[in-house]
Each structure stands twice: as structure tokens, then as C-alpha cells.
């Protein structure tokens, strides 16, 4: 039995925010919110409506995207104010390939009818379906030239698995749905991505579902399976380093409430949505102002709009690997079920959702999202020794709310968190794990390297290829209303030349309001600046405009030339921050159709309109990037590599909003006495 003192110290980290406590309630039966994800019944209704028009008996029909058609913002805001008086019809946007043509279909579920049905004639194709990829990866295993290549390498065909990779666009005039197929050895390890079969080019046509291009160029060694297994059941002692168990105890239950997809916690309220392309969507984030006695809107909607992953190997083996994980594979379709007590702590609450197959059938995705509280840090503190004969110590415990989901696209796992703080901050973060993209080589030691490998030798015969991860967040701020502005406050050095001070210099600030979208293209560098979205129509008691500041992630800038084909498609990474006039249809930074796209429908193209953004409904886009130079510690599976940014209130409140917040009090463990 631990001592009482030890127990109290341990209980200090108990995740019970008693000052804002509410018992959790996950309510399965609730009034549907206009932004709720599609239900099983809605997916089935969409499937039926489309198949009634295009019977599968005489049409080749595949659903590539089924998602909520965003309601008009003013309708949603009126619903928030008067939910019983405002009725918003559920409209569903469908992208389907029917007889080799891409259809954009809008369905009104209230009247169970197709409102519009248009054919996309431009460049690019929709998200790849899981079904067609599953068929394509089997093609090499029955393809005689590939079977001959396997025999030539002395490999066992039954121990080979293949994977599909989008091909991008490199100036070709043809507009055909093709993928590259790379194959790997699964013999003696499930860690297939570290055992590539190098030197073979395989291209498959997804519409014809056959191999249309094949080259066996050269033979490189297949990296060994030794020390690559990551399944604990396949590993043997010694294990380590040893970790001791940590237990959290919430005797009065969690401090948050879930009603359908709406979450209340501490002073925050927000909605959790889900989309087969975007994955998790945070909407209608409002915070309660204790002094003003009302909730105040901060963020109308936020999600990851795109993830651009360009590899930096220009050779035949890798040049095409310039992936757009959201637009080509779907963040929602790639979301995985969270593992209780591993991906999320024991006290987490889980939310299920649905995605769809290529034939439109809904697929239950259990534990897609988890919500939990965790001890954060110190909320605020001060020790005052300046008053004679008095010693003053004040400190407050910080407990934060986390909303988490994990997206696994091929070899990489993306842990996506939205962290809410009672102090008013929202902190989105990304943590990467998974497997490096490995290129096989005959080189076993660094001393053998005679040319640029385009990566690092992380193990014998294994090159971890240089690459980037560029996430772009869509952040539709509504600071106390829809009319906002974007301000850049630069910190300027001032020299004192008149001898009025013993100092020779100081710094001050200079604020500029971006008038147009061009003014709001920001490259974050060495020059310090504050980037703030303000409501110019509402001011604090002392006259400051209320606002929220972006504390950006550590900046990463694209290193490809602007005329390189991948960078043309990923031109939204040219700046770290963009601000655009709100347009309901401008959701995807890489364009609606990303596979084989040509960069003609991206954030970089939209902003050429140079629309006015002063005192308008505006959207901020923040690029969060990581230049990944692989290291041996990333092999055979990499520990989490994380980055984050913060949306922090700036003159939004009259004073510190958590000044009167009480720390969670110590509680007794069951079965233990004080």
C-alpha cells in the first residue's frame, strides 16, 4: 500500500476537472445535427437512389466519394440559435465513375431525389477506391513477365505481396486512370515496406484492370527480414526499456459530455464531424466567457484539407512518388479503428462512424474517434517573494481535452489530435509513426556509397528515401461573428539616435491589415511577426479588437522548383499561411480531383482572384511541414515524430479567462485510506 503522501502526489494528475465537471453521456438517439456525418441509413439511401437511375445490371458504377454537401453557413448558424425552428434538408454530394465517366451527383435526401447530375470533363480523377486497389495489387501475381522476374531473382512468388501507388502527372497529355504497382517480400516478417523488390516497373490501368506497362530494369538485393519484425508476439527477450504502469482515476466520471456528435467540456462546445476524404472535422467551436455570461464563436470549421508527400528520388524507381494522401486515398477511408488502452487511455470515450465501399455499401468503422481528458501542464503559477514577511505561492493544474483519430495511408500512420484548453487555446497536432519508404540497394555500408542515394542508408541494403510531409489545415475562423480580418504585426527594431536614453535600440510593433488575398500570403522566416484573425467590429473595454492568434508550427518550405510537376500540383505549400474569402466550394487545397491532376484547381489558383478580405467571412490555411531525413532510429518502425501549432486568444477576453479556475482536488483511490 502506498503512503498517503505518495497517493496524493499521484492523484494530482487525476483527470477530473471538477470545477467544470459534467457526467459523460454518449446518446445514440438524438436529433440529427445539420453537420452530423452520414448514417448507415443515409449511405443506403444514396446507394439506392443512384442505382435506380443507373442500374448495375447494365452500368459499370463505382462510388468514389459520398459526403455531406455543406449546408449554407447562415442556415447552420440560424439552426444553432433556433434548432427547433430551422430545418435544413440533408443534401449529399456523390462522385461516382459510371461507364468510365466521372459524375458529380447532388442528392436531396429529404425528397429522395437527384437534384443534379453533371459529368466532370476536366483533368484529374477522384479518390481511389479500396476495392479497385485490392483488385489491382493481385494483377502482378498472375502476370507471366512478373512471374519470370521473380524466378530470375530466386524469390518465392507465394511470399510476395504488392501495393498500389498513385502516379501523379509529369506533363503527359493522356488522361488515363493508372497506378504503379510495387511488390514486397512478406517472408519472415509482416514489415513488408522494408523488403521491396527493386528494379521492376509495373503500371496498371484501373478501368481496364490490367497491366499496361512492364519493365524489368535491374536486380538489387532484397533487404533481409532480420530484426524488422515489430509484432510483440514475434519478438523475444530482452525487452526494454521498462515502463511502469500509470493509472488515472475519475471517481465522478469524465468532465465532458457527448450528445450525438456535439461535445461539451469545461468552457468549450464543439461538433465532431467525419468525412470520407477529410476524416475528422471540428465545427462550431465556441467558448463560454465567464465575464460576459455567454458562449462566443471561435472556429466554424477546421480539418486537414490535404497531405502532400513528395519523395526526393528522381530515378525511375521513385520519381512518381509524390502523393496527396487526402485527395488520392481519402483520410476518412484510411482512418483506422483505435486500440483501447493503447491509442487512447482507459478513460477515453469512443465514437463510431461509417465509410462506404465502391458499390456504396456502408462500412462500420468502430472506434474511429476517441475523446479523453489528460493532465496537460501547469495552467498558470507564480511565487511572490517581494512582499516582506509574506510568502505567496499559487499554481493551477491544467487538464486538457483531446479529440483523436489515426489515419494510416500505406506505410505511414498519422496520429491527428485536436487539443482544447480551458484557457481558450486550440492546439491541433500531428504525430507520425509507421514504416519508412525503403529502396533496396546492394550497398551494405556507408563506405561503399559513391553517388547520391537520395536518402540515408538505415540498414544493410536499405535506403530510407528523403521526403516531405506537408499538411494543410483549413481553418474557418468566425471570431464573434462571420466578419473578420487578418492582421500581421511585425516586430521592428528602432534605433535611438537623439541621445534621449542610455539605450541604443528597442523593438516595437507595426500592424498591417491584409486587404486582399495576395496580402495574406505569408512565408514564415526569421523576421518575427504575430498573425492574428480579428473581428474589427468588436472591441474589448480598453479598445483592442478581439482576435485569435496563430502560433505556427516550425516552418518547413518546399524545396522543389516551382516549375516541377509535383510542385505545380502542390503549389499550396508555396506559403506557410494563406487567407481566402470564404467560398463554400473551396474545401480541398489540392483540388476536387487530385489523382493525375495538373494543378489547375488548387488554393494557389483560387487566390489569383485576389479577393478582398477586410471585414469579410475569411478562411485561414496553415501549412504544417516536416522535412524527413531518415535515420537508423526510424528503422524498422519509427517512434512518433510530432509537430503542432496553436490557435490562441489574443485580446479576445478582458483578462486571463482561467484566473478563477480551481485545480482538480485530490481524491482517494478505491480501497485506500487517507
From Swiss-Prot:
Residues annotated as binding Mn(2+): 476-478, 617-618
Keyword match Aminoacyl-tRNA synthetase: no
GO terms for biological process, alphabetical: amine metabolic process
List of glycosylated residues: 156, 389
PTM entry text: Topaquinone (TPQ) is generated by copper-dependent autoxidation of a specific tyrosyl residue.
Record-level Gene Ontology MF annotations: copper ion binding; diamine oxidase activity; primary methylamine oxidase activity; quinone binding
Entry-linked PROSITE patterns: COPPER_AMINE_OXID_1
Residues making up the signal peptide according to the UniProt record: 1-25
UniProt KW keywords: Copper, Disulfide bond, Glycoprotein, Manganese, Metal-binding, Oxidoreductase, Signal, TPQ
Pfam family, one: Cu_amine_oxidN3
Cofactor details (free text): Binds 1 copper ion per subunit. Binds 1 Mn(2+) ion per subunit.
Region span, Disordered: 226-251
Binding site for Cu cation: 467, 469, 628
Compositional bias annotation for Polar residues: 226-236
Main enzyme class: oxidoreductase
Disulfide feature: 162-183, 344-370
Residues that, per the record, bind substrate: 323-334, 409-414
Catalytic activity from the UniProt record: a primary methyl amine + O2 + H2O = an aldehyde + H2O2 + NH4(+)
Sites of 2',4',5'-topaquinone modification: 412
This enzyme's EC code(s): 1.4.3.21
Required co-factors: Cu cation; Mn(2+); L-topaquinone
Catalytic residues, chain numbering: 325, 412
UniProt similarity note: Belongs to the copper/topaquinone oxidase family.
Subunit description: Homodimer.
Name the UniProt record assigns to this protein: Primary amine oxidase
